[in-house]
Structures are given as structure tokens and as C-alpha cells.
């Protein structure tokens, strides 16, 4: 079963000022069926919120944790929840 879920991920490392949010949005659009956003946080992390099919959210998480991201990812903290359905598209904030 590929139910809809909400993924919240906090990405640590050198992830600001390197196009990380732009590439995250591009990857979400490439996967398709995801809505949400990528946001720079004041502490240097990037927060990624994605809602959609579990398979798509897992694909985005796998990409965030992989070696194909811009900058340098030192770690990703994730949280899974039920979707809120309050996003239209995938935005850079």
C-alpha cells in the first residue's frame, strides 16, 4: 500500500548558499506527486517538508541522504506523520 504521508526532514551540513533548496525542489518535481517546501533555518540547516505518496517521500529522503546533493550533507533527521494537505506545489521558502 502506498498511502499518502508527510515527511519532515532537517538537513545538516554545508547546505545553505549552495543551491540546496533549488535542487531539492527540482528533485521533488522530478519524483512527481509531492507538495511542500524547502526552507533555510537560522541555525544553518535546511528544513524539507514533503507530502504525497510514501514511495515518493522515501525517494526524496533517499536523495537527501545520498551523495548527489549540492554542498555537503552531514546528517538528516526525519519525522513521518499524516499529511495536512495544506501545500500547493513544492516551494522554496
Swiss-Prot record:
Domain Acylphosphatase-like intervals: 6-93
UniProt keyword Hydrolase, yes or no: yes
Reaction(s) catalysed by this chain's protein: an acyl phosphate + H2O = a carboxylate + phosphate + H(+)
Keyword Hydrolase applies: yes
InterPro entries associated with the record: Acylphosphatase, Acylphosphatase-like_dom, Acylphosphatase-like_dom_sf, Acylphosphatase_CS
Gene Ontology MF annotations: acylphosphatase activity
Gene3D superfamilies xref list: 3.30.70.100
Source taxon at top rank: Bacteria
Signal sequence extent: none
Record keywords, A-Z: Hydrolase
Active site (record annotation): 21, 40
Sequence similarity: Belongs to the acylphosphatase family.
Name the record gives this protein: Acylphosphatase
Amino acid at each position: 500500500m502506498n498511502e499518502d504521508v508527510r515527511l519532515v526532514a532537517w538537513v545538516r551540513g554545508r547546505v545553505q548558499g549552495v543551491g540546496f533548496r533549488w535542487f531539492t525542489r527540482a528533485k521533488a518535481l522530478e519524483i512527481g506527486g509531492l507538495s511542500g517546501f524547502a526552507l533555510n533555518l537560522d541555525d544553518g540547516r535546511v528544513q524539507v517538508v514533503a507530502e504525497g505518496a510514501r514511495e515518493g517521500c522515501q525517494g526524496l529522503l533517499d536523495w537527501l541522504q545520498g551523495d548527489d546533493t549540492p554542498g555537503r550533507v552531514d546528517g538528516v533527521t526525519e519525522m513521518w506523520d499524516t499529511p495536512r494537505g495544506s501545500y500547493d506545489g513544492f516551494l522554496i521558502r
